[in-house]
């Protein structure tokens, strides 16, 4: 379900977005079941670069906000899940944590690097390595990025990770 902010986001209508965000309240943009999503998630969902950039300039505390949905997806992980290199780069350029935010209370721990490997997206793996992603993280099942690459048979990604691990030492 799209709320007025979500409709403006989908339509890339920055003037309406600015007007809707002018008040003290932060209206939600989209809802699904019992969950609601703000403009940042919605901009990624609709692949709206200008809206995402505007929202990132408006919310400078991006890493202090807890952005993690019920599946442990942070903004960056969500962009990776959608294989959106362009928006992932924008998030990283604006300083979002390269490893995402992992709350100790989340049932699932989903890291951007793991999502890139699971999708066999070499370009996204390279982007995370460029921003020095932690290659020693473990997901909810205790799997590391290298183990996942081996498990999925992603040989090129496995080689990239091994090179990245050497550089991080």
Language model regions located:
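Leucine-rich solenoid repeat scaffolds
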Residues: 136-168
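Intrinsically disordered, low-complexity regulatory segments in ankyrin-centric signaling systems
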Residues: 1-23, 34-49, 53, 57, ...
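Ankyrin-repeat boundary/"N-cap" motif
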Residues: 1-5, 30-40, 65-76, 101-113, ...
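Ankyrin repeat domain, specifically the short helix-to-loop turn at the C-terminus of the second helix
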Residues: 19-28, 53-62, 89-98, 126-134, ...
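Eukaryotic tandem repeat interaction scaffolds
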Residues: 70-73, 77-91, 97-102
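Conserved ankyrin/ankyrin-like repeat signature
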Residues: 16, 50-51, 86-87, 123-124, ...
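Ankyrin repeat A-helix N-terminal signature
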Residues: 7-12, 42-48, 78-84, 115-121, ...
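Alpha-helix initiation and capping sites
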Residues: 13, 26, 33, 48, ...
């Amino acid at each position: 379900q799209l709320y007025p902010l979500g409709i403006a986001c989908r339509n890339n209508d920055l003037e309406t977005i600015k007007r809707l965000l002018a008040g003290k309240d932060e209206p939600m943009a989209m809802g699904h079941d019992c969950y609601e999503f703000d403009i940042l998630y919605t901009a990624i969902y609709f692949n709206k670069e200008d809206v995402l950039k505007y929202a990132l300039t408006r919310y400078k505390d991006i890493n202090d906000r807890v952005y993690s949905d019920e599946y442990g997806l942070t903004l960056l992980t969500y962009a990776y899940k959608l294989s959106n290199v362009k928006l992932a780069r924008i998030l990283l350029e604006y300083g979002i944590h390269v490893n995402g935010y992992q709350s100790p209370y989340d049932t699932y721990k989903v890291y951007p690097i793991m999502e890139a490997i699971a999708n066999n997206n070499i370009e996204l793996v390279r982007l995370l390595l460029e921003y020095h992603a932690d290659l020693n993280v473990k997901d909810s099942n205790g799997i590391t990025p290298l183990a996942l690459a081996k498990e999925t048979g992603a040989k090129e990604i496995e080689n990239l990770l091994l090179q990245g691990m050497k550089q991080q030492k």
